[in-house]
Amino acid sequence: MELKIEHLSKQFKDKTAVNDVNLTLIPGVWGLLGANGAGKTTLMRMIADIMTPTNGAVYYDGKDIRELGEVYRSKFGFLPQDFGYHRDFTVKDYLEYMAALKDIPTRATTPKINHLLDILSLSDVKKKKISNLSGGMKRRVGIAQAMLNDPEILVMDEPTAGLDPGERVRLRNFISEFSHDRIVLISTHIVSDIEYISTRNAIMKAGEIVDVGTTAELVKQIEGKVWNCTIPASKLPECEMRLRIINQRGEDYNQVSIRYLSEHSEIDGSVTTEPRLEDLYLWLFPQTDLEKEDR
């Protein structure tokens, strides 16, 4: 199974949202990382065949998805950033409605819905109106509808938005299990969503794919550029002004442990440390504030 993206571009008036993207996806979990505005959502929508590209095409096992039409869509699951629903739908009503739209046999609908409700901790609210649910619960309903047809290709745009830490962990574990013999593409700017479950990652910047590889392959480019050191707490404001500090932790005796990015040591006593995918993300997108992005 293969999903091949060839020379895919999307132009909106005088803005190029996606520019000549080439990417071949094989089974496993793929992370699509990029800051807000990088073009991730536009790319997702073209892969989902709900937006027509200006140039290029997407091929599923060698066939253009626009020609495959319903055959492709029957194998596809999609979670957009925002999904629509009738305000009076209960969770169960909505999932039954979506199952009917996806031509899932009636005899299979109830057990499939019950399984997803259980996995996504929605069983207790299945009779509640979606409009009355919290943002995190609505997100989980959206995830459930994307998985109803047991898709071979699952694309999720910011799947953990609004989920609490425990829900994020459960979802990551579920996705990891689900991905066997399937293509799962997760578009996110929350690096922890995919750092430990992705088979490969694609980095998107200004509408282009700038790098592709496993986490281990990608972080090699910042080896020797991630530093740890301990400083007096009184020195922290000055260091924050001149360094790219990506983490800090208070220690005993008015000391602060900091982790920072730099081509070379900036503070006496600094030692290099093993880079993570989050470090690479912040290296590539220096204006990103992870806490603000996470919200």
Where are the model-predicted features located?
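Conserved ABC transporter NBD signature motif
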Residues: 56-67, 71-72
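Walker A (P-loop) phosphate-binding loop of ABC-type ATPase nucleotide-binding domains
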Residues: 35-39
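Helix-to-loop junction immediately C-terminal to a conserved catalytic motif
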Residues: 48
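Catalytic Walker B motif of ABC-type/P-loop ATPase nucleotide-binding domains
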Residues: 154-158
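ABC transporter nucleotide-binding domain
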Residues: 170-258
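Conserved ABC ATPase "signature" region
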Residues: 96, 100, 107-125
